[in-house]
C-alpha cells in the first residue's frame, strides 16, 4: 500500500517550516481552530492534484511576506521510497518533481498518490451540480482503467473544438467535423463509466449499511444524452439548439450519478448530517473498489472528524480505514474524541508548528 514516509512543508498558508514523519497508518493532528491542522491535509492534497480543496486562488496558499511555498514527501510505493515535491511562486510558476525528474503532467502525481478527501463540505456531493459527481466516477476510472485518461483527454479536445466552432457560428461542415471523434470517445467513456458504476453499487450498499442502515439509497447513472438515441443521433437532433446556445448540450460531459431514496432525490429527504454520512459511505466504497481492482488503497484525508460524526460513526471510520489498510490523516480539536488504534501517531499543531507526541 502507498504511504507517505516523510512530509516537509515550507511557507504554505501558516505552516512556515514543517518536517514530520507520519505513521504508515493512523495520523491525528489536533489543535485549536486556525492552528494549521487543515493546512497539513491541504498541502498533501495540493501535491497530488495541483489545486486546493479550500480555495480557487492559489496565491492565498503562499504564506504572507514570502514569495513561494514548497511541499515535499517521500512516498513508499510498495517496493521503495520515492521523492515527490512541488514548488510554486507568487508569479504562478510551479515545478513538480517526481523521483528527481521534472514531471510533465500532474496526472503522474495523482496516479502515484491516490487520495480520498473528506471535509466539512463533503455533503455538497448531493447538493452541487453533476460535475462533482462525474469527477467522483472519473477518479475511480483514472485509477482502475488504463485507457481512461487518454480517452478523456481526446474527448476534451474534440469537445473544445466543437464548442469553439459553435460559438463562432462556423459553417456546419466545420462543426460536424468533430462529431465522429466526439462520438467515438464519448461512447467509450460512457461504457467505462457504466462498468465502474455496476461494480461500485454493491460496495456502496455495503458501506452504507455501516453508516445509515435504515436508508437503502440507490445510485442511478445518467450518461448525458437520451436513451432513445445514439450519441451521433443526439448531436444531429440538437445541432440547431447547439448553434443558438454556442455549446454542445449532449454528451458524456453532461453525465451524472444521482442517489435516490424511495424514488425521491436523496438530498430532499436526508438531513445535512445524514448527507455527510452518505458521502463517507461513497468514499469508503471508492477506496474498497480501488483496492479490489488494483490491490492499492488510497490515502484518506479527513478534516475535523470529531465535529462531523458521533462517537459510534467515528469508530466505524477508524475500523474501515483499518480494514482497507489505508494511511489516514485526520484533524480535530480534541484527541480524546478519537479512539486511536495502537498503530498511530498523534501530532499537536499550534501557530503553524507541528510536533509529534
Swiss-Prot record:
ATP binds at residues 31-38. The keyword Nucleus does not apply. It comes from the Bacteria. One of its GO terms (biological process) is DNA replication. One of its GO terms (cellular component) is cytoplasm. Keywords: ATP-binding, Cytoplasm, DNA damage, DNA repair, DNA replication, DNA-binding, Nucleotide-binding, SOS response. It is found in: Cytoplasm. One of its GO terms (molecular function) is single-stranded DNA binding. Belongs to the RecF family. The RecF protein is involved in DNA metabolism; it is required for DNA replication and normal SOS inducibility. RecF binds preferentially to single-stranded, linear DNA. It also seems to bind ATP. This is DNA replication and repair protein RecF. It comes from Coxiella burnetii (strain Dugway 5J108-111).
Amino acid at each position: 500500500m502507498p504511504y507517505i514516509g516523510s512530509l516537509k512543508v515550507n511557507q504554505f498558508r501558516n505552516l512556515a517550516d514543517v518536517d514530520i514523519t507520519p505513521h504508515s497508518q493512523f495520523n491525528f493532528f489536533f489543535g485549536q481552530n486556525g492552528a494549521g491542522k487543515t493546512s497539513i491535509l491541504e498541502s498533501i492534497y495540493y501535491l497530488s492534484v495541483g489545486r486546493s480543496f479550500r480555495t480557487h486562488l492559489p496565491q492565498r496558499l503562499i504564506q504572507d511576506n514570502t514569495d513561494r511555498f514548497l511541499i515535499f514527501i517521500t512516498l513508499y510505493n510498495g517496493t521503495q521510497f520515492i521523492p515527490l515535491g512541488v514548488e510554486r511562486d507568487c508569479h504562478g510558476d510551479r515545478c513538480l518533481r517526481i523521483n528527481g525528474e521534472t514531471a510533465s503532467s500532474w496526472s503522474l502525481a495523482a496516479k502515484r498518490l491516490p487520495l480520498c478527501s473528506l471535509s466539512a463540505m463533503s455533503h455538497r456531493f448531493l447538493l452541487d451540480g453533476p460535475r462533482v459527481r462525474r469527477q467522483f466516477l472519473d477518479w475511480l476510472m483514472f485509477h482502475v482503467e488504463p485507457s481512461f485518461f487518454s480517452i478523456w483527454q481526446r474527448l476534451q479536445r474534440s469537445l473544445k473544438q466543437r464548442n469553439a466552432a459553435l460559438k463562432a457560428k462556423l459553417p456546419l461542415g466545420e462543426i460536424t467535423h468533430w462529431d465522429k471523434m466526439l462520438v467515438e470517445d464519448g461512447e467509450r467513456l460512457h461504457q467505462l463509466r457504466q462498468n465502474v458504476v455496476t461494480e461500485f453499487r454493491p460496495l456502496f450498499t455495503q458501506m452504507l449499511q455501516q453508516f445509515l442502515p435504515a436508508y437503502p439509497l440507490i445510485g442511478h447513472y445518467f450518461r448525458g444524452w437520451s436513451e432513445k438515441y445514439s450519441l451521433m443521433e443526439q448531436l444531429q437532433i440538437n445541432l440547431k439548439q447547439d448553434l443558438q446556445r454556442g455549446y454542445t448540450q449532449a454528451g458524456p460531459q453532461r453525465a451524472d450519478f444521482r442517489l435516490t431514496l424511495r424514488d425521491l432525490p436523496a438530498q430532499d429527504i436526508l438531513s445535512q448530517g445524514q448527507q455527510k454520512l452518505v458521502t463517507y459511505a461513497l468514499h469508503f466504497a471508492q477506496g474498497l473498489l480501488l483496492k479490489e481492482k488494483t490491490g492499492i488503497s488510497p490515502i484518506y484525508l479527513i478534516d475535523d472528524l470529531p465535529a462531523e460524526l458521533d462517537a459510534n460513526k467515528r469508530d466505524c471510520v477508524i475500523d474501515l480505514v483499518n480494514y482497507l489498510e489505508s494511511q489516514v490523516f485526520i484533524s480535530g480539536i480534541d484527541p480524546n474524541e478519537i479512539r486511536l488504534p495502537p498503530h498511530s501517531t498523534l501530532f499537536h499543531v499550534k501557530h503553524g508548528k507541528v510536533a509529534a507526541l
